[in-house]
Amino acid sequence: MCHVSDDIYDYIYVSQGKTKVDSIDDNEELEYTEDAFNVLGFSTDEKFDCYMLTAGVISHGGIEFKTKGRDDQAECEAIGPDTFPGKVAGALQVDPFPLIKAYCKPRIKVGTEWVVKGQTCEQATNAVGGIARAIFDRVFKWLIEKCNDTLIDATLKKANFCAVLDIAGFEIFEYNGFEQISINFVNEKLQQFFNHHM
C-alpha cells in the first residue's frame, strides 16, 4: 500500500536517532494508531491519505541527486516505480518526472517572465527537505484540527481561570536532528495553545 520497506535504515529522516526501544512493539503501536483513528471518526480515505503522505515524507529522504555537466546542475538518474522518487510520487499520487524536474529545475518568476533555473545538488536536496517538512507540517496540523473537531464539545461554556504552563525545550541546535526539532515545535505549539485557551 505505502510502498515502504521493513528496514528503518532505508529512511534517513526517521533513522538518525535511536530506532529500537525494547519495550515498544511497532506493530502493536500501529494497531493502536488505527484504533485511535477509528475512535476519532476518521474515514477510510482520511486514514489512507495520512498513511500515504507519511510514507511520502519519509521516502523524500532517499531522493539523491548527481551533478550533471559543467554547470554543477543536479539531476536524478533513477526515477522508476521502485526508486525513492517513484515511491514519493506514488505516495503523493503525482507523476515522478515533473516532481523531480521541480526539484532540479524549478520555474521562477523574473520580472514578468517565468524562467527555468538549474539547481545544484545541495539546492535540490534542500528543496526536497523543505517540501517534506511542509507536507509533515500540514499533515500534523490537519490531524490536530481533526482531533479537535471530534473532541471539542461546542455546548460547553467557557470558564475563566488562570493557568501557567512551561514545557522544557532542548535547544542544542548543533546536535539536534529533525526529530528533536519536531518535538520542540510541538512543545511550543502546545504551550501557545494552552496559554491562549487556558
How should each PLM-predicted stretch be described?
Residues 1-198:
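N-terminal switch/interaction subdomains of large nucleotide-dependent motors and GTPases
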